[in-house]
Amino acid sequence: LHRGPPGSRGPMIPPLLSLPPPPRGRGPLRGGLGPRSGPYGRGWWGVNAEPPFPGPGHGGPSRGGFHKEQRNPRRLKSWSLIKNTCPPKDGPQVMEDKSDRPVCRHFAKKGHCRYEDLCAFYHPGANGPPL
């Protein structure tokens, strides 16, 4: 009960509670820096090997994630380019060529298709002569 509220109030009380018992000699030195680097100080004082490894370790996946995130917008851009370039090309083709293709089952059942002009199948009366 006592640990929760001080932790939520600010970082000054946990360093004062945690630093004097383990490093008594260096406690006063950390006292001045405690409010700023208290949580980090614990990690460095606790195990010196842990803070360096999570840094690069987390950096690697995050960087990989950033690369993937950068690639995904490129893919989205490429899809947007495809979407932007296909409708003008398909515009004339939609009215002419789609009549040779099978009838769109969604258009046949519902009378409409969510892909509309982008659909690869034949929409009678929409992208070709009615049946």
Curated annotation (Swiss-Prot):
Entries under SUPFAM superfamilies matching the protein: CCCH zinc finger
Cysteine-cysteine disulfides: none
Zn finger region (C3H1-type): 98-126
Keyword Zinc tagged: yes
PROSITE patterns in the record: ZF_C3H1 (PS50103)
Entries under Gene3D superfamilies matching the protein: Zinc finger, CCCH-type
Composition skew (Pro residues), residue ranges: 12-25
Pfam families xref list: zf-CCCH
SMART domains: ZnF_C3H1
Sequence segments annotated as region (Disordered): 1-77
Protein's UniProt name: Proline-rich protein 3
Annotated source species: Sus scrofa (Pig)
Gene: PRR3
